[in-house]
């Protein structure tokens, strides 16, 4: 018995090596704090807290995020649902109802242009 045909298995092609970035993920202030050194005031200049407005904002952001903690979920849920002008009530359990089946919903051309509320 002889083998006929072509194999359906193909060897994987060699992958091209891509140099990974130096850091993966969000940068945190402690990771780059040693790179940015605060400007030292000269003898003739009065010492100010922060001369760079971007660095001043960074300092404010650090203090604000450290004291508040995570935002409440109820606030984030409100932002997730944009108001469309047609505010429907929640279901009888207080939970949101599932969206209607698109096959059952009539388009304005098919129906008499009634509100779905």
From Swiss-Prot:
- Which gene is this protein's source? GAGE12H
Composition bias type Acidic residues, residue spans: 32-45, 87-96
Question: What is the name listed in the Swiss-Prot or TrEMBL entry for this protein?
Answer: G antigen 12H
InterPro entries named among the record's database cross-references: GAGE, GAGE_fam
Name the family: Belongs to the GAGE family.
- Any further remark recorded for this protein: This gene belongs to a multigene family expressed in a large variety of tumors whereas in normal tissues, expression is restricted to germ cells. These genes organized in clustered repeats, have a high degree of predicted sequence identity, but differ by scattered single nucleotide substitution. Their sequences contain either the antigenic peptide YYWPRPRRY or YRPRPRRY which is recognized by cytotoxic T-cells.
Chain segments carrying region Disordered: 1-117
Biased composition range(s): Basic and acidic residues: 103-117
Q: Source taxonomy lineage?
A: Eukaryota, Metazoa, Chordata, Craniata, Vertebrata
């Amino acid at each position: 018995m002889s083998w006929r045909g072509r194999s359906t298995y193909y060897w994987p092609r060699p992958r091209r090596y891509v140099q990974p970035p130096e850091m993966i993920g969000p940068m945190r202030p402690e990771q780059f704090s040693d790179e940015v050194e605060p400007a030292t005031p000269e003898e003739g200049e009065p010492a100010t807290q922060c001369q760079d407005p971007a660095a001043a904002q960074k300092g404010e952001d650090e203090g604000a995020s450290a004291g508040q903690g995570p935002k409440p979920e109820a606030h984030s849920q409100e932002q997730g649902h944009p108001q469309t002008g047609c505010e429907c009530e929640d279901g009888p359990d207080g939970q949101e109802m599932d969206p209607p089946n698109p096959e059952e919903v009539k388009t304005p051309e098919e129906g008499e242009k009634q509100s779905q509320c």
